[in-house]
């Protein structure tokens, strides 16, 4: 998650939501829950270290998923199960029960990491800090989710809507949000999750309410190849990519909605005196607008078509007598598609988290980023992504770290937000808040 600058022109927090949050924070039950958080930090750290020592590369999360399912059972969640793609579920009832057609508040955290299975997982603790791959992203998020689940089963808090806890797979890299895609495409969940709170990484200073979309492609150009002397004139895939890149990168992009592109990888050829048989590149397109991403994708495809035509014609002019076949083939392979979306400024979930931050005197910015929340936001559903508290750094490196100082604030923030959305002590849960 790499946030960009905050939303502007947010409306005032709905007074009714602010009153609800203040009432919740002052209740004896919630004060008891806050005390539970203070006394259980050693358990949270133990869980975080245990989990971080279990490899969970993209498409290889099963061992960590099994560990999380066992922890869900251990803390007492209901209906613990693992779905077809590896997502882990556990439920906690509201006083309205689990009836047919019931709406849920979802708390999720991705269990995968960017690191391959062969990565040494040398997790160590030094004071309040943990060090090692994945301890923050997303060790902090999963630990926070597990801590909230354990708290709710230990300190009974009355709320209307049931909660579903989800450890989802496939957030990082080539996972391409596959876990959340699966959840929001299944009949069981796509229409029954009223609000989604996604926990991603450490911190308590951001609220992601806008989904940064991205489309990624691998482009492969193939030609006849040959010797640089005897086969001079044959179309050159590297030249085709160079021409396409020159045309594509000259395309204008808007500053609002912000839209970007990048050529991140380019490969081709075997030696200086060989005409390559193939060349490839990887392209990243990002925007907060689906329409802008589609426009840039079309621009890329047109640039490639033009480059193929130009190089084919140039090859014919260079050597009208060439004996080698001159056919050129260009393939554009999608390797990532994260949809864009935006939470309405008046959405109840945004009022709730902002009211909680005001209650806790916590300064947080509303931002955009690419997270698991992209999926529900792109479907027009209410979702945010926030951190699991504490602080962290070195994400996606072997030097990653997490500091538990400040975790308690993050957990209070998560708990109050869930209770506000689930209608704690309020039979009118699930309304608009106004």
Region annotations inferred by a language model:
Residues 1-32, 49, 53, 237-434:
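Metal-dependent amide/peptide-bond hydrolase catalytic core
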Residues 2-131:
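Acidic/His- and Gly-rich active-site-bordering loop/insert found
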Residues 107-109, 166-168, 196-200, 220-222, ...:
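Short beta-strand segments
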Residues 111-125, 208-220, 355:
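Acidic-glycine-rich active-site phosphate/pyrophosphate-binding loop
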Residues 115, 157, 208-214, 272-277, ...:
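Short glycine/proline-enriched loop/turn "hinge" motifs that connect secondary-structure elements
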Residues 121-134, 222-225, 358, 395-396:
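Glycine/charged-rich beta-loop-alpha catalytic/anionic-binding loops adjacent to active sites
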Residues 129, 134, 138-212, 254, ...:
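Acidic/histidine-rich catalytic neighborhood of metal-dependent amide-processing enzymes
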């Amino acid at each position: 998650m790499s946030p960009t600058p905050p939303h502007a022109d947010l409306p005032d927090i709905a007074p009714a939501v602010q009153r609800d949050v203040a009432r919740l924070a002052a209740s004896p039950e919630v004060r008891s829950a806050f005390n539970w958080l203070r006394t259980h930090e050693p358990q949270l750290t133990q869980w975080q270290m245990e989990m971080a020592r279990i490899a969970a590369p993209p498409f290889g999360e099963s061992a960590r998923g099994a560990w999380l399912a066992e922890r869900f059972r251990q803390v007492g969640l209901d209906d613990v199960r693992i779905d077809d793609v590896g997502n882990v579920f556990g439920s906690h009832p509201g006083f309205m029960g689990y009836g047919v057609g019931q709406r849920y508040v979802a708390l999720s955290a991705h269990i995968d990491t960017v690191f391959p299975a062969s990565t040494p997982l040398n997790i160590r603790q030094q004071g309040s800090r943990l060090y090692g791959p994945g301890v923050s992203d997303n060790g902090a998020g999963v630990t926070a989710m597990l801590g909230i689940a354990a708290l709710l089963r230990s300190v009974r808090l009355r709320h209307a809507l049931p909660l579903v806890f989800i450890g989802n797979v496939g957030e990082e890299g080539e996972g391409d949000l596959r876990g959340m895609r699966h959840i929001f495409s299944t009949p069981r969940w796509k229409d029954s999750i009223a609000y989604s709170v996604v926990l991603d990484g450490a911190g308590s200073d951001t609220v992601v309410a806008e989904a940064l979309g991205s489309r990624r492609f691998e482009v492969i150009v193939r030609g006849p190849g040959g010797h640089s002397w005897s086969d001079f004139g044959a179309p050159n895939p590297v030249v085709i990519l160079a021409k396409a890149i020159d045309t594509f990168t000259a395309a204008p992009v808007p500053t609002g909605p912000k839209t970007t592109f990048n050529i991140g990888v380019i490969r081709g050829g075997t030696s200086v005196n060989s005409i390559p048989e193939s060349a490839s590149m990887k392209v990243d397109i990002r925007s907060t607008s689906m329409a802008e991403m589609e426009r840039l994708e079309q621009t890329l495809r047109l640039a490639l078509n033009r480059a193929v035509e130009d190089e084919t014609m140039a090859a014919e002019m260079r050597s009208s007598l060439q004996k080698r076949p001159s056919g050129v083939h260009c393939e554009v392979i999608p390797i990532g598609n994260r949809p864009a979306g935006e939470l309405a400024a008046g959405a109840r979930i945004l009022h709730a988290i902002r009211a909680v931050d005001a209650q806790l005197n916590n300064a947080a910015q509303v931002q955009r980023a690419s997270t698991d929340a992209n999926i529900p936001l792109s479907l027009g559903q209410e979702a945010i992504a926030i951190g699991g508290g504490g602080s962290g750094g070195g994400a996606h490196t072997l030097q990653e770290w997490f500091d538990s100082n400040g975790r308690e604030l993050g957990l209070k923030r998560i708990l109050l937000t869930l209770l506000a959305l689930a209608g704690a002590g309020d039979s009118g849960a699930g309304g608009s808040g106004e």
